[in-house]
Amino acid sequence: MDLYAVWGNPITQSKSPLIQNKLAAQTHQTMEYIAKLGNLDSFEQQLLAFFEGGAKGCNITSPFKERAYQLADEYSQRAKLAEACNTLKKLDDGKLYADNTDGIGLVTDLQRLNWLHPNQRILILGAGGATKGVLLPLLQAQQNIVLANRTFSKAKELAERFQPYGNIQAASMDSIPLQTYDVVINATSAGLSGGTAPVDAEILKLGSAFYDMQYAKGTDTPFIALCKSLGLTNVSDGFGMLVAQAAHSFHLWRGVMPDFVAVYEQLK
């Protein structure tokens, strides 16, 4: 049976095996998908041994996306620009192909919500690894992006890297342009730890819809809770993005595109 896995550390919290096995059942694909704990010191050796043992592909989650990318022989454009991958596929010639389906997963989920239309203004909060993976597909969907980060230089470096692909400008968190935004996307770790609000409430009130790339089982993420406390109710967490990026990884491996919305509805 074809073997796939998700690699991360920690990994017990991962929903990927549940999601991928639902996608396989829906599309009548015979495969096994498991969770694997990556060793912080010897991840590269583990991953190469996994593929040498006959595995067909895997997903990569924190903190290994950049390290896995370095092991690949060939890359999609979106993985190359992100310098990170969440998906590896073993090609027929034995080479490893790296892709990053995070951004197309986000775009697909925004389409599910009917929040994505050409030539919108999108405000992204945070310029870390999560953001790197989503910028190209958003720009390819003809979105105008303001990328805000506490450290302006980090936002500026990322915006400059992606400027050839569309309209993107950098801002610091306290110099965000005062204009309306069709979607505000939280890509900071505020969703994980609680912590302080990533941005001033007055900026949030300029938004029409609010998307958190994090998700929390059975409760609101801190960012979603903050939005609701301000009376901003057009909100979504990132669980749909998680299912959609999984569906795009599945499509790369199996050549079949599942109905991700059906699986999302089952699991949410």
UniProtKB/Swiss-Prot annotation:
Its EC number is 1.1.1.25. The active site is at K65 (proton acceptor). Pathway: Metabolic intermediate biosynthesis; chorismate biosynthesis; chorismate from D-erythrose 4-phosphate and phosphoenolpyruvate: step 4/7. Keywords: Amino-acid biosynthesis, Aromatic amino acid biosynthesis, NADP, Oxidoreductase. GO terms for biological process: amino acid biosynthetic process; aromatic amino acid family biosynthetic process; chorismate biosynthetic process; shikimate metabolic process. Gene3D superfamilies: Leucine Dehydrogenase, chain A, domain 1, NAD(P)-binding Rossmann-like Domain. It is an enzyme of class 1 (oxidoreductase). One of its GO terms (molecular function) is NADP binding. SUPFAM superfamilies: Aminoacid dehydrogenase-like, N-terminal domain (SSF53223), NAD(P)-binding Rossmann-fold domains (SSF51735). Shikimate binds at S14, K15, S16, T61, N86, D102, Y215. Coiled coil: none annotated. CDD domains: NAD_bind_Shikimate_DH. One of its GO terms (cellular component) is cytosol. The keyword NADP applies. It catalyses: shikimate + NADP(+) = 3-dehydroshikimate + NADPH + H(+). NADP(+) binds at G126, A127, G128, G129, A130, N149, R150, T151, F152, S153, K154, M213, G238. Pfam families: SDH_C (PF18317), Shikimate_DH (PF01488), Shikimate_dh_N (PF08501). PANTHER family: BIFUNCTIONAL 3-DEHYDROQUINATE DEHYDRATASE_SHIKIMATE DEHYDROGENASE, CHLOROPLASTIC, SHIKIMATE DEHYDROGENASE. Belongs to the shikimate dehydrogenase family. HAMAP family: Shikimate_DH_AroE. Homodimer. NCBIfam families: aroE, PRK00258.1-2. Involved in the biosynthesis of the chorismate, which leads to the biosynthesis of aromatic amino acids. Catalyzes the reversible NADPH linked reduction of 3-dehydroshikimate (DHSA) to yield shikimate (SA). This is Shikimate dehydrogenase (NADP(+)). It comes from Haemophilus influenzae (strain PittEE). The lineage of its organism: Bacteria, Pseudomonadati, Pseudomonadota, Gammaproteobacteria, Pasteurellales.
